[in-house]
């Protein structure tokens, strides 16, 4: 049967086809991209050491002014910091990104390319061309690449632009279909190229007796994205000064981890994503750290206030503690998780 199946693949002419035991070329996730936040990594992948799937589309959605762009730029910074040869293609539809903004966020401007796009068709054509050019390189010459679209909600269509130019006020009813077609093609190409993409989008409250938060743009991105994260925020203050935001991240949809889980991450104006924020709550829930009155009891028996731990995280989140938290994250976020190695016994 094995020989027959290989003949079927050969004769079918489908370059993506493979026997599952050999790996599913465009489907298997063989690596993850660190987002710069351990708890956000866990929400997306079930591991504090994971993050964005390296060959999938991830959507980050929220209402206006929830920090979607700054959140995405924090991920971009961490991606570029992790590999000096990495590059970012940033499709931008809001005319909101400036060179100073990129430099102020600590992002290397020499390795980030901005593609201004107005329509879905422009984005689709240029994104596919980028991926095709990337795949045309010898595999050994391909450096890590990250694609971003900020934002989907601001993209028009060719028809809408033409109608506006002609003074017509008719609504373009084809936009959802054009988007769906674009993401159908991109999903497979990104999977094969092993290139991640993050798309920001807006949300709105649906009409009805029980209103729910919905993502704009039709069903195209909803079906194409492996994860959809809804963002909301509250201001982070140091005394009376606003120094950033606490971003509430809800896993609205995921093919890799449990849906409807929520975590908080901290995004500061000067440092971007806080790598350790959110781990304290996970440590408390799984008794890696035990809450005793207003302090936390550490495995060595010492007690510290939560603020002291967060102010010096590298001292307290040791390699052993991070291993226990990784086990906790697997249990908390992964489907059917239940590691044979228990969290309490991981240091035996």
What do these predicted regions represent?
Residues 275-305:
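Long, well-ordered amphipathic alpha-helical subdomains in the mid-to-C-terminal portions
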Residues 58-60, 89-91, 113-115, 198, ...:
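Hydrophobic/aromatic beta-strand patches that form the interior of the parallel beta-sheet core
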Residues 172-286:
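Phosphate-binding/switch region of NTP-binding enzymes
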Residues 2-111, 128-132:
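The Walker A/P-loop phosphate-binding site
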Residues 25-27, 39, 242-245, 252, ...:
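Peripheral, non-AAA+ core regions of ATP-driven protein-machinery
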Residues 25, 63, 74-75, 79-181, ...:
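Conserved inter-motif catalytic segment of the P-loop NTP-binding fold
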Residues 294-348:
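Terminal-proximal interaction/regulatory segments of ATP-powered molecular machines
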Residues 6, 10, 38, 42, ...:
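Solvent-exposed alpha-helical segments within well-ordered globular domains of core cellular machineries
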């Amino acid at each position: 049967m094995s020989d027959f199946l290989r003949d079927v693949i050969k004769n079918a002419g489908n370059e993506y086809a493979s026997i599952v035991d050999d790996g599913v070329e465009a489907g298997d996730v063989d690596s993850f991209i660190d987002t710069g936040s351990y708890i956000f990594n866990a929400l997306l992948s079930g591991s504090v050491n994971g993050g964005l799937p390296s060959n999938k589309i991830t959507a980050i959605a929220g209402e206006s002014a929830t920090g979607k762009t700054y959140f995405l730029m924090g991920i971009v910074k961490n991606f570029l910091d992790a590999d000096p040869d990495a590059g970012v293609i940033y499709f931008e539809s809001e005319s909101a990104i400036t060179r100073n903004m990129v430099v102020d966020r600590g992002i290397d401007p020499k390795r980030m390319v901005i593609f201004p796009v107005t329509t879905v068709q422009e984005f689709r054509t240029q994104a596919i061309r980028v991926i095709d050019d990337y795949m045309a390189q010898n595999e050994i010459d391909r450096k890590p690449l990250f694609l971003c679209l900020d934002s989907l909600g601001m993209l028009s269509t060719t028809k809408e632009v033409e109608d506006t130019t002609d003074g017509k006020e008719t609504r373009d009813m084809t936009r959802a279909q054009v988007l769906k077609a674009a993401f159908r093609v991109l999903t497979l190409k990104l999977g094969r190229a092993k290139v991640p993409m993050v798309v920001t989008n807006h949300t709105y409250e649906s009409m009805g007796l029980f209103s729910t938060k919905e993502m704009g743009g039709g069903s195209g991105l909803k079906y194409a994205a492996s994860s959809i994260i809804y963002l909301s925020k509250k201001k982070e203050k140091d005394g009376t000064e606003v120094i950033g935001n606490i971003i509430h991240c809800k896993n609205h949809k995921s093919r890799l981890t449990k849906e409807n889980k929520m975590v908080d991450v901290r995004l500061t104006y000067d440092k971007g994503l806080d790598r350790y924020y959110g781990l304290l709550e996970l440590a408390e829930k799984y008794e890696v750290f035990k809450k005793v009155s207003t302090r936390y009891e550490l495995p060595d028996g010492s007690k510290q206030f939560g603020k002291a731990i967060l102010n010096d995280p590298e001292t307290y989140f040791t390699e052993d503690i991070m291993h226990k938290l990784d086990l906790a994250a697997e249990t908390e976020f992964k489907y059917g998780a239940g590691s044979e190695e228990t969290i309490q016994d991981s240091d035996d």
